[in-house]
């Protein structure tokens, strides 16, 4: 095939120490030269424009007929209030638009935490400033919250079913606030002209960075499928021809060194699985019972363990040695098309070498 010999990353690495609901730092390597920029730019554009989110699309303020009108007893006019409303991050469960309300009659500062919602709407930041009410003033508003993608103009937010007095406003639905990517040189063995792609991602909290990145990649993949006019060939694996060697030193290593996806890592963390030794003693059935742990995460973990000569369902004997499960009970899958680890022991991004020169793609050092 035309792409025979192409180097492709095996998994996405991330910085577990800095990962939050609003920020994530991810990287992958090695890419063939030029692919880092191609993929990074495409992902960034999709992340900023096409991830679905909720935003206020229309506002009705008591006593206000248009957005340039002032409100008696309120410091801000309608325009300033609308601008402040656009800064509030929401999470909307379900696809139907929702009506939310704000009623304030006491003098003082009005914030997003004073908005009345139902169970399907979550205000992610309750401290966003909206307005200040003076003595004798009041603020009574009804707002329409709606899902969408990217930027939507006020004209497109006008619906026939909007009640009298509603002012359509332009809205920004994207939960991704900022996205940067960078490409630097990566080394594979003695070859140094591969790409390492790093992506930094900030969201408003309605979607966590890992899920946003996954959605963007899925959207790109779905659009590319129509260009594929042939059946994909499955790479032949030679791993089954080799008898895996169990490395006892791996059993005491932390699962953080496995360079798992964010979802798989969080599942192990929630299951209180700290070391590789604890992990290999779990069966497939036990792992699938873990909350949010699916078949994709299971296959990912099995592949990583297989590259280390380990598998799920193993027993640890009195000498600390891992004993493989009975033949045929849980066959360890091959890893990509590679018979074992890259270099000397360990995994891609783990404690071993990637063609020499230290760990490849750990949390803090590239290991070149």
UniProtKB/Swiss-Prot annotation:
Output the GO biological process annotations, alphabetical, semicolon-separated: DNA-templated transcription
* Region Alpha N-terminal domain (alpha-NTD), residue ranges: 1-231
Catalyzed reactions: RNA(n) + a ribonucleoside 5'-triphosphate = RNA(n+1) + diphosphate
* EC number(s) on file: 2.7.7.6
Keywords assigned: DNA-directed RNA polymerase, Nucleotidyltransferase, Transcription, Transferase
Q: Which SMART domains would you find in this protein's record?
A: RPOLD
**Which SUPFAM superfamilies would you find in this protein's record?**
C-terminal domain of RNA polymerase alpha subunit, Insert subdomain of RNA polymerase alpha subunit, RBP11-like subunits of RNA polymerase
A single GO cellular-component term from the record reads: cytoplasm
Annotated HAMAP family: RNApol_bact_RpoA
Query: Which NCBIfam families does the record associate with it?
Result: PRK05182.1-2 (NF003513), PRK05182.2-5 (NF003519), rpoA (TIGR02027)
Q: Family, per the entry?
A: Belongs to the RNA polymerase alpha chain family.
Q: How does it assemble?
A: Homodimer. The RNAP catalytic core consists of 2 alpha, 1 beta, 1 beta' and 1 omega subunit. When a sigma factor is associated with the core the holoenzyme is formed, which can initiate transcription.
Q: Any idea what this protein is called?
A: DNA-directed RNA polymerase subunit alpha
């Amino acid at each position: 095939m035309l792409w025979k010999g192409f180097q492709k990353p095996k998994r996405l690495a991330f910085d577990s120490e800095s990962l939050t609901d609003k920020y994530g730092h991810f990287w992958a390597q090695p890419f063939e030269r030029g692919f880092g920029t191609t993929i990074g730019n495409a992902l960034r554009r999709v992340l900023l424009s096409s991830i679905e989110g909720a935003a206020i699309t229309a506002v009705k303020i008591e006593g206000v007929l248009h957005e340039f009108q002032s409100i008696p007893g309120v410091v801000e006019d309608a325009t300033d209030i609308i601008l402040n409303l656009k800064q509030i991050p929401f999470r909307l469960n379900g696809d139907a638009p929702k009506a939310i309300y704000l009623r304030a009659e006491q003098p003082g500062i009005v914030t997003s935490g004073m908005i009345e919602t139902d169970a399907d709407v979550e205000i992610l930041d309750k401290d966003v400033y909206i307005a200040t009410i003076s003595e004798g003033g009041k603020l009574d508003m009804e707002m329409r919250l709606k899902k969408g993608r990217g930027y939507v103009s006020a004209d497109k937010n006008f619906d026939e079913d909007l009640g009298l007095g509603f002012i359509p406003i332009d809205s920004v639905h994207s939960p991704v606030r900022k996205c940067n990517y960078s490409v630097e040189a990566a080394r594979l063995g003695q070859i140094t002209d591969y790409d390492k792609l790093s992506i930094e991602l900030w969201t408003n909290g309605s979607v966590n960075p890992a899920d946003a990145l996954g959605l963007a990649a899925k959207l790109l993949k779905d659009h590319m499928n129509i260009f594929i006019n042939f059946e994909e060939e499955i790479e032949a694996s030679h791993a089954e021809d080799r008898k895996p060697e169990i490395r006892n030193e791996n059993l005491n290593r932390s699962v953080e060194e496995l360079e798992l996806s964010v979802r798989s890592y969080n599942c192990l963390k929630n299951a209180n699985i700290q070391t590789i030794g604890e992990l290999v003693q779990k069966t497939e059935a036990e792992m699938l019972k873990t909350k949010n742990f699916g078949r994709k995460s299971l296959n990912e973990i099995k592949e990583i363990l297989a590259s280390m000569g380990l598998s799920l369902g193993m027993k640890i004997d009195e000498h600390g040695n891992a004993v493989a499960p009975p033949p045929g009970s849980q066959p360890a899958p091959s890893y990509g098309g590679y018979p074992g680890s890259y270099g000397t022991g360990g995994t891609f991004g783990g404690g071993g070498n990637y063609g020499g020169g230290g760990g490849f793609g750990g949390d803090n050092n590239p290991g070149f």
